[in-house]
Amino acid sequence: MKVSYHGHSVVQIETGGKTILIDPFITGNELTDLNADHVEADVILLTHGHNDHVGDTVAIAKRTGALVVAVAELATYMGFQGVENVHPMSIGGAYQFDFGRVKFTQAFHGSSFTEEDSQKIVYTGMPGGILFTAEGKTIYHAGDTALFSDMKLIGERHPIDLAFLPIGDNFTMGPEDAKTATEWIGASLTVPIHYNTFPPIKQDPHAFVTSLQSGEGRVLEVGETIEL
């Protein structure tokens, strides 16, 4: 399994001949190396409905026919936007797809999509994290979240090989809370995400990784790939 980081919270997974994108915020993301008009995807997983996570989902899904997996309200909203291939889920639920197993975990954040043209904010269900398992490996993408005590339970119940945790502060947990989350989750490797995209979430990811136990964390540069 190949896992790549593409800035902000964008993660790409390649497994079993399938390409999976998590939170494909590309247009407007000055940190990413992806092009929304050319990126390929068989599956798009969405942690929640904020614009900087839904990103280019609709355009990519329409162009590629990708399956969009999200909590029920967000999946329904994607359908309203013309996405034909959606799979609704809910927090705590899991489903075995042909490309891997997806389970939605709790996250403490908001979830809504801002329609700037009409100045409307659309409710898109509960925010979540995602546990993705394939090829005997489990990845935890926490989405946007505060630190919460059930992260201990997530770590106890699921042996996690790779965790993506937000460190930006302001909108999510910051480095200190993310360090505690790392300890509670107990992943083999933790990668910081959701930082430096906008001024309010400017952080030093290398300082965060240095604060962890040796070997527990790693900064992935934009476009960098690791193999599990």
Curated annotation (Swiss-Prot):
Pfam families: Lactamase_B_2. It comes from the Bacteria. GO terms for molecular function: hydrolase activity. InterPro entries: Metallo-B-lactamas, RibonucZ/Hydroxyglut_hydro, UPF0173, UPF0173_UPF0282_UlaG_hydrolase. The keyword Hydrolase applies. Keywords: Hydrolase. HAMAP family: UPF0173. Belongs to the UPF0173 family. This is UPF0173 metal-dependent hydrolase ABC2731. The lineage of its organism: Bacteria, Bacillati, Bacillota, Bacilli, Bacillales.
